[in-house]
């Protein structure tokens, strides 16, 4: 299930549907239902009544609270059912075939500037690099490169990192940590 249908949620729906998965989707807001169903998902009208034991994972949008100020009820239901919670970035990492370097940037301030700058420098050096994640295109909407033909420079929020148990970028950049 994809829960939280903003731009990253829709990208996750499209990616999972394109990969042949049966996709369920939900949101506290019903406004994106039609667009979500057109993208290949079955809409879950009441996520609080859904059987999470039937799922492989729940992909949470970055804005869905996992811990603070309190977990969203969907998080509690999924965890109680033994269903893993993951982010779109985790899904992006799992979808990679072959080896194309991934540079992941996080921190309180300066993520977007650093992400854009690294991608620009790599491109100026003659490499093929694309910036995405929380800057520009969602990670799951980035082009799929042939093995070794491109570098992904991804801006990642702390909320997404919490839900990336297997994501292993080739380079990780932690800019700073300050109260926000």
Question: Can you say where each PLM-predicted feature lies in the sequence?
Answer:
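Phosphate-binding loop of NTP-binding sites
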Residues: 53, 66-180
């Amino acid at each position: 299930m994809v829960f939280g249908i903003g731009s990253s949620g829709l990208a996750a729906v499209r990616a999972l549907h394109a990969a042949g998965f049966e996709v369920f989707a939900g949101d506290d807001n019903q406004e994106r239902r039609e667009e979500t169903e057109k993208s290949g998902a079955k809409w879950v009208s009441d996520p609080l009544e859904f059987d999470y034991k039937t799922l492989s994972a729940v992909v949470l949008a970055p804005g869905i609270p996992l811990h603070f100020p309190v977990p969203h009820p969907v998080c509690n239901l999924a965890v109680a059912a033994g269903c893993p919670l993951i982010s779109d970035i985790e899904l992006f990492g799992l979808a990679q075939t072959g080896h194309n370097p991934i540079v992941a940037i996080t921190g309180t301030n300066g993520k977007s500037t650093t992400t854009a700058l690294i991608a620009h420098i790599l491109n100026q050096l003659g490499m093929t690099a694309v910036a995405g994640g929380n800057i520009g295109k969602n990670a799951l909407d980035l082009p799929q490169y042939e093995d070794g033909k491109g570098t992904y420079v991804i801006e990642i929020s702390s909320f997404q990192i919490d839900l990336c148990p297997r994501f292993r970028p080739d380079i990780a950049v932690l800019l700073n940590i300050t109260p926000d």
